[in-house]
Design a protein with these regions (language model features):
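N-terminal secretory signal peptides that target proteins for export/translocation
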Residues: 1-4
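Bacterial N-terminal signal peptides
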Residues: 6-18
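Aromatic-Pro/Gly-enriched surface loop or interdomain linker
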Residues: 23-152, 158-159, 285-288, 292-322
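An acidic, glycine-rich "communication" segment
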Residues: 29-41, 51, 55, 191-291, ...
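Short alpha-beta junction capping motif
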Residues: 76, 147, 152-192
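Active-site-proximal beta-strand/loop segments in catalytic clefts of secreted hydrolases
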Residues: 79-82, 155-158, 184-187, 211-214, ...
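Extracytoplasmic/secreted envelope proteins and their assembly/folding machinery
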Residues: 118-122, 168, 172, 192-196, ...
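Surface-exposed patches in mature extracellular/periplasmic domains of secreted proteins
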Residues: 131-141, 183-186, 206-214
Length: 322
C-alpha cells in the first residue's frame, strides 16, 4: 500500500505572508532523445530527475531536507509516455500545430512545461507549506520499478498518449495500491476521448465523475471560489491579453484549441471507497502557471499567483490526505 500520509506531517501549517507569498523570482530526433521546449534534449531512457535537465525559464533555489526526512518527502513525479504520431489531434493542438515537428518533439507530449513546472511547483510547496519536498523532482516511465515509491504521478499533453500492455498493467497496480494520477493541459474533445480510451484499459468499467466547486478539493487549503472559469489558466503563448477576470464571459484563451475547448472541467475516477485514483483537469493549463512564473509579471499575477499555485497546492493536500 502506498502511504500518502507520512510525507504530509504538518502540512496545514501553511506560511501566511499576505499578497507577497508568491514573490516572483528573478529571471535570468528519434530514439530515446526528446527535444525540450526551451532547447536541448532529454534522454528518456536515462533521465532520473527534473533537476538534471536544463531549465530555460528561471533560476531556482536549491534546498536540502533534514537527513531524517530525506525519504519521507513529497516528490513531484512526472511520467514519460509514448505519443503515437498517427493519432489525430485537434488543429492547433500539440503536434497538430504550434509545437509540431522537430527532432522527437511533437511526438512526445510528456515534455511540455518540463522541467520548469516540476521544479517551480516543488519549490513553492516547500516554501509555502511545512511539507518536506524533494528539491529535484522525478521523471520516469510507468514500468520503472521505483514507481511504487511515489504516491503521486503526473501527466500532461496526453492527446497522443498510447499505453503499452506493460504500462497498462503497471498503472493499474499502482492506482489500486493507493497511488494517484493527475492529468493536466489537454484541450478539446479529441484529447478527452484519448484519455478516456487509454485509461479505460487501466480501469475498465469505471466512470468519470465531474467535480463541482463544492468539492472539498477546491477548499482544502485555499478557499477557492467559483465559478470554475475563475480557476482556468491559459497557456502563456495563447493568453488573451484583453482578458477581464471580473467578466464571466471573458475568455482567457486567445486561440482555438479544438472542438469542445471552451469550458474547463475537472473530472475524477474513484475507487469503491470514493478515493480519487485519477484526477483530470481538462481545458486548462495550471502547469504553465508554474513553468512561466518568472517570464511575465502580468501573467504571473493573474494566473500563477491567483490560480495555478493555490489550485495545485489544494490538489496535492487533498489527494495526499484522502
Amino acid at each position: 500500500m502506498i502511504d500518502r500520509v507520512k510525507i504530509l506531517v504538518g502540512l496545514l501549517a501553511l506560511i501566511a505572508n499576505g499578497g507577497n507569498s508568491f514573490a516572483q523570482p528573478d529571471t535570468d530526433g528519434g530514439g530515446s532523445l526528446t527535444r525540450l521546449e526551451g532547447g536541448g534534449y532529454v534522454d528518456e531512457d536515462t533521465v532520473r530527475t527534473a533537476r538534471e535537465t536544463l531549465s530555460h525559464s528561471v533560476t531556482l533555489p536549491e534546498w536540502k531536507n533534514p537527513s531524517a526526512f530525506e525519504k519521507d518527502v513529497f516528490t513531484f513525479t512526472r511520467i514519460i509516455f509514448w505519443a503515437d504520431p498517427a493519432k489525430q489531434v485537434e488543429r492547433g493542438g500539440f503536434g497538430g500545430g504550434g509545437f509540431g515537428g522537430g527532432f522527437g518533439f511533437g511526438r512526445r507530449g510528456w515534455v511540455v512545461d518540463y522541467p520548469d513546472a516540476d521544479l517551480n511547483f516543488s519549490h513553492r510547496l516547500q516554501q509555502l507549506t511545512s511539507m518536506k519536498v524533494d528539491p529535484d523532482a522525478r521523471v520516469m516511465k510507468l514500468t520503472n520499478p521505483d514507481l511504487f515509491d511515489f504516491p503521486f504521478i503526473y501527466m500532461e499533453h496526453i492527446e497522443r498518449m498510447t499505453l503499452r500492455p506493460a504500462e497498462v498493467l503497471a498503472l493499474q497496480k499502482y492506482l489500486k495500491a493507493g497511488g494517484v494520477l493527475l492529468v493536466n493541459d489537454f484541450w478539446g474533445a479529441l484529447a478527452w476521448k484519448n484519455l478516456r480510451d487509454e485509461i479505460s484499459k487501466v480501469l475498465p468499467g469505471r466512470t468519470w465523475t465531474e467535480l463541482t466547486m463544492e468539492h472539498p478539493i477546491f477548499h482544502s487549503v485555499f478557499n477557492l471560489q467559483g465559478p470554475m472559469s475563475r480557476l482556468r489558466v491559459p497557456s502563456m503563448q495563447r493568453w488573451n491579453t484583453d482578458y477581464n477576470p471580473n467578466d464571466p464571459n471573458s475568455n482567457p484563451t486567445a486561440s482555438y484549441r479544438g472542438e469542445g475547448y471552451e469550458t474547463m472541467h475537472v473530472q475524477a475516477l474513484l475507487d469503491d471507497k470514493q478515493r480519487i485514483m485519477v484526477l483530470a483537469i481538462h481545458n486548462s493549463d495550471i502547469s504553465d502557471g508554474w513553468e512561466r512564473e518568472g517570464e511575465y509579471m502580468d501573467y504571473f499575477k493573474l494566473f500563477s499567483e491567483a490560480r495555478s499555485y493555490p489550485l495545485g497546492i489544494n490538489i496535492i493536500f487533498y489527494l495526499m490526505t484522502h
